[in-house]
Curated annotation (Swiss-Prot):
Biological role: Quinone reductase that provides resistance to thiol-specific stress caused by electrophilic quinones.
Catalyzed reactions per annotation: 2 a quinone + NADH + H(+) = 2 a 1,4-benzosemiquinone + NAD(+); N,N-dimethyl-1,4-phenylenediamine + anthranilate + 2 NAD(+) = 2-(4-dimethylaminophenyl)diazenylbenzoate + 2 NADH + 2 H(+)
Enzyme Commission identifier(s): 1.6.5.-, 1.7.1.17
SUPFAM superfamilies for this protein: Flavoproteins
Pfam family, one: Flavodoxin_2
Enzyme class: oxidoreductase
Oligomeric and partner information: Homodimer.
UniProt protein name: FMN-dependent NADH:quinone oxidoreductase
Designated gene of the protein: azoR
Coiled-coil stretches noted in the UniProt entry, renumbered to this chain: none
Listed cofactors: FMN
Protein family membership: Belongs to the azoreductase type 1 family.
Domain of life: Bacteria
GO molecular function: electron transfer activity; FMN binding; oxidoreductase activity, acting on NAD(P)H as acceptor; oxidoreductase activity, acting on NAD(P)H, quinone or similar compound as acceptor
Length: 193
């Protein structure tokens, strides 16, 4: 099995989402499993007009600048395709995702790679038979409330890619009771089969 762990918190030290994702990885990893690790804060992901326009033209028509921009996108898509299990840790920043996580999703959304258009115009995700775990933390936002724009969006994006098995581990409203939130998230991790 290949496990793809993606951390998106801007905080390297003292990040609750990173710490919980590490606990989850230790819980589900079996001897012989391979881990692909991606720290989105290290990559400084960025989507420009060049990237966006390059996604709409055939590879043979792309400039050298387009091709260079696609090296990272190709790598992200490859990591997703290779993996059986995906762990994404993300704090809620201003009610939504970290900018690097949004850019990761934009760079991974590739026609013919992670999704395709069917003859009727509807989209179909191409990344089937994968399990995703979302480790979501927040200071004050209640998960799945009208203020949480991260969790439903990220679940939608993964479904869009074809990943239908998505489980959420949450440590929300940590500013109100940090210990309680962390313990509840740790219990959710312990209960994963």
């Amino acid at each position: 099995m290949k496990i793809y762990q993606i951390d998106s918190s801007a905080r390297k030290e003292g990040s609750s989402s990173r710490a919980l994702a590490k606990k989850l990885l230790n819980k589900i990893k079996k001897p012989g499993d391979e881990v692909i690790y991606r720290d989105l804060d290290d990559d400084m992901l960025f989507v420009s007009g060049l990237t966006e326009s390059g996604m709409k033209i055939a590879e043979k028509d792309q400039t050298e600048e387009h091709k260079k921009m696609f090296e990272l996108s190709d790598k992200l898509v490859s990591e997703l395709k290779e993996s059986d299990i995906i762990i994404i840790s993300a704090p809620i920043y201003n009610y939504g995702p970290p900018a690097t996580l949004k850019a990761w999703c934009d760079l991974a959304a590739r026609i013919g790679e992670t999704f395709k258009f069917k003859p009727n115009g509807r989209r179909e995700g191409l990344l089937k038979n994968k399990q995703a775990y979302l480790v979501i933390t927040s200071g004050g936002t209640k998960l799945n409330s009208s203020e949480d724009f991260l969790t439903p969006w990220l679940k939608f994006i993964l479904n869009f890619f074809g990943i239908e098995k998505v489980e959420v581990i949450s440590a929300d409203q940590m500013a109100l009771d940090y210990e309680k939130s962390i313990k509840e998230a740790e219990k959710q991790i312990e209960n994963i089969i």
